[in-house]
Amino acid sequence: MAGKRFWILLSAAGLLLLDQLSKQWWLQNLPPGVSQSWIPGLLNLRLVWNDGAAFSLFRSGSQWLGWISLLVSVGLLIWIGRRGRQWSRWQAAAAAFLLAGSVGNGIDRWRYGAVIDGLELVPFSFPVFNLADVAINLAVLCLLIEAIRQR
């Protein structure tokens, strides 16, 4: 049934919209580099630009990372089109999360030459991140759950 593919794409579009709206809000309302408490003791908002990959790896590699994001996104769309009907819920969720995350950060790389990050965990020393990063990590979690479930 094409219904599962539709829901994967709709979910990815919704997550992508949340990612892009949050980044635009950060750009309009946060001074660069200044932490502002959002959820006291847990989460701050801090606008930073990441021209590398996850956790600022491969700094200044935004152009080729933009191409990688584009290739991952196109590959996922083809994969969803061909196999999406056969996937479990966990696999479908992983595809939606991964598509939203790769497109979300890819848009930033193509528009700005860097990814906009704005979420900072307070209790831990952890790089600033965004909703697209969260989506990519949730995709990995969904795939791990599916792998355990199939054992």
From Swiss-Prot:
Catalytic residues as annotated in Swiss-Prot or TrEMBL? D117, D133
Instruction: Tell me the membrane topology, using the record's own terms.
Output: Multi-pass membrane protein
The EC designation for this entry is: 3.4.23.36
Segments passing through the bilayer: 61-81, 88-107, 128-148
Q: Which UniProt keywords apply?
A: Aspartyl protease, Cell inner membrane, Cell membrane, Hydrolase, Membrane, Protease, Transmembrane, Transmembrane helix
Can you list the GO cellular component terms from the UniProt entry? plasma membrane
- What protein family is recorded? Belongs to the peptidase A8 family.
Q: Name one GO molecular function term.
A: aspartic-type endopeptidase activity
Localization in the cell: Cell inner membrane
Chief localization class?
Answer: membrane
Fetch the HAMAP family from UniProt. LspA (MF_00161)
Provide the GO biological process annotations. proteolysis
Catalyses which reaction(s): Release of signal peptides from bacterial membrane prolipoproteins. Hydrolyzes -Xaa-Yaa-Zaa-|-(S,diacylglyceryl)Cys-, in which Xaa is hydrophobic (preferably Leu), and Yaa (Ala or Ser) and Zaa (Gly or Ala) have small, neutral side chains
Stored InterPro entries: Peptidase_A8
Role of this protein: This protein specifically catalyzes the removal of signal peptides from prolipoproteins.
User: Pathway of this protein?
Assistant: Protein modification; lipoprotein biosynthesis (signal peptide cleavage)
Keyword Cell membrane attached: yes
Which protein are we looking at? Lipoprotein signal peptidase
Q: What class of enzyme is it?
A: hydrolase
Record-linked PANTHER family: LIPOPROTEIN SIGNAL PEPTIDASE
From which domain of life does this come?
Bacteria
Q: Which cysteines are joined by disulfide bonds?
A: none
